[in-house]
Amino acid sequence: MIIRRRLVLKYVVLTIVSIACMACLTLNIQAKPILTVYTYGSFVSDWGAGPKIKSSFEQICNCELRIIGLNDGVALLNRLRMEGGNSPADIVLGLDNNLIDLAKKTGLFTESHIDTSLLKLPMELKNNIFIPYDYGYFSFIYDKRRITQAPKSFDELINSTQPWTIIYQDPRTSTLGLGLLLWIQKVYGEKSAQIWREIAKRTVTITKGWGESYGLFLKGESDFVLSYSSSPGFQLLNYGQDNYAAALFSEGHYLQIEVAAQLKSSKQPKLAQEFMQFMISPTFQKILPITNWMYPVIDMSLPTVYQKILVPQKSLQFHAEDITQHRNQWIHLWQDAVSHQ
């Protein structure tokens, strides 16, 4: 009887110890801080930069990196404005140079202490809140099997006797769509309304974001899709398809610089700063050219596939303040033009 009691007591003690150890292990797992990043949908896709970024950062941060893919860049800012100081996000990654003035005026973002003096960009972007992480040029992509003589200017695309069709993104939700709005405004100025009416005649559909529009294009739903001059590299590298190309326009191409920023309401400010610093490191930057298909912001060699990618020789820009001042007016002009077709 005594032996049995001792065995029972030993079993009880071991059980208590095991439960305690499991509880400690659970607490340790739960104690890992979580850094939440809002970004656009394509960034977190299986072929996007997100999965590799998550793996690389978690190896050095002793944290969980939670990357949440939403809609395109403009929609990201709209979401943050709606959430205000109650946003669960610590960082937003996916705004761009065309939104930084508008984003700054929301008061939702805090200064960063990241040294950007060594960054290599096509234009100067001095800002201590919004940190650049890549850049690219807006362009219309086409399939060389369908289009044997690509347009060499906006005028050729719009005024061609060929029944060419276009898919692009909504400027109210997408940084690409906003980029096209600014591109046309920069090239045509007061004639922009007429240009939009001509584009409307060729438009198959207008999507909320890049992923949907590019997917439709690859299915053959249009002759041209608004994307980036570097986009054809994806099919070339992953599928060996060299039939996609960017149409280079004599008027020049609008430049986009993508940026990230830390929210004032972040519950992990130190970890957020660590991620922002990591963002301009070689480890992060080398992932982008063949996942996000954009150019890095540090001095580094590009993958060999970029040797076959066309690069615009002329880039176009508006000052950020001009965009903030006229953005709503230009969007209304676009809405009016396309709604009357």
Question: Residues of each region from the PLM?
Answer:
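Extracellular/periplasmic bilobal clamshell ligand-binding domains
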Residues: V305-Q341
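Short alpha-helix C-terminal cap/hinge motif
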Residues: P51-I67
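Extracytoplasmic ligand-binding site segments that recognize negatively charged/polar headgroups
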Residues: I34, Y38-G50, N71-A75, S87-S222
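A bilobed periplasmic-binding-protein/Venus flytrap-type ligand-binding module shared by bacterial periplasmic
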Residues: S139-R146, Q185, Q256-Q268, I287
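Periplasmic-binding protein-like
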Residues: L121-M123, G136, W196-A200, I206-T207, ...
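A ligand-binding cleft/hinge motif common to bilobed small-molecule-binding domains
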Residues: N98-L102, L218, S222-N243, N292
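Mature extracytoplasmic/periplasmic domains
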Residues: L263-F318
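Short beta-strand->loop
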Residues: T110-T116, N128-P132, D155-I158, L236-Y254, ...
